[in-house]
A protein has these predicted regions:
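Asp-box/WD-like beta-propeller blade repeats and closely related beta-sheet repeat scaffolds
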Residues: 1-25
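Beta-propeller domain segments
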Residues: 18, 36-66, 70, 76-78, ...
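A conserved catalytic-loop motif detector
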Residues: 33
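Beta-strand-turn-beta hairpins that frame and shape the catalytic cleft
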Residues: 25-27, 64
Length: 243
């Protein structure tokens, strides 16, 4: 892809650019998450962002030929992990939320796509995470085109833990309750007064394929004094069933 065809050159940034790629086995296309280059952008940016998929997700045909870019999600701040549920093909993704609102707010998110559409909106910039309104947009009415297509998060994670990579457990080593559960990595905070994160979370799904319960699965990468000994980035199942 030539420069400017993924991200318009005037919008190139070292912040939150193209993040994660994954192939959807249902349509054999490549899905790419596109982070927003701001903590919270001004309203003048969103017509372009929604059009090209910045702060959202796009997909491409994987074969040579015409670039068939499609926007499949908007209103995402900065997703650094997505995967497809092997059982029903649904798209799930993490989302890192707004900074500068305090140590305990807003929550990070684990989302399930309500549909793969350029109209499906996941809350940003009017929501900073979960149902918490951003300071910049809290007094602004949510446009109807967003409100009627709003897809709420499945899970609110603790604020500023930096939820990154995620995957569905496909191995046989772990007990049955973990089959097809979502494991997700919390990289850990960068500007919170009290550091948090640095652990692996697990989210169990119910019979309808929605989030039922989320809890820590593995911890120990941070000392009692808040010093990081390790910072998980992603979680993948190895061929023997280990993580």
């Amino acid at each position: 892809i030539d420069q400017g065809n993924l991200i318009p050159e005037e919008e190139e940034s070292y912040n939150h650019t193209a993040r994660v790629c994954a192939i959807n086995k249902k349509d054999n296309k490549l899905y790419v998450s596109m982070g927003q280059p701001f903590n919270v952008a001004g309203p003048d940016k969103y017509p372009l962002y929604d059009q090209v998929g910045i702060g959202g997700m796009i997909r491409f045909n994987r074969f040579p030929g015409k670039l068939d870019r499609e926007v499949v999600a908007i209103g995402i701040r900065n997703s650094v992990g997505h995967a497809f549920n092997p059982k029903d093909g649904s798209l799930w993704f993490t989302d890192n939320q707004v900074d500068g609102m305090g140590d305990e707010t807003p929550p990070g998110e684990l989302n399930k796509a309500c549909s793969l559409s350029s109209k499906t909106w996941y809350g940003h910039p009017y929501y900073g995470g979960g149902n918490v309104r951003t300071n910049e947009y809290k007094d602004k009415k949510i446009p109807e085109k967003y409100a009627k297509n709003y897809c709420k998060p499945q899970v609110d994670m603790i604020a500023h833990a930096a939820d990154l990579g995620m995957s569905f457990y496909s191995g046989k080593m772990f007990p049955k309750k973990y089959k097809n559960a979502i494991f997700s990595a919390q990289h850990g905070s960068w500007n919170a007064v009290k550091p948090r994160g640095a652990r692996v979370m697990v989210t169990y799904l119910d019979k309808k394929g929605n989030a039922a319960k989320t809890e820590p699965f593995a911890e120990g990468w941070m000392t009692e004094d808040g010093v990081y000994l390790g910072r998980p980035v992603d979680v993948q199942t190895y061929i023997d069933g280990s993580l």
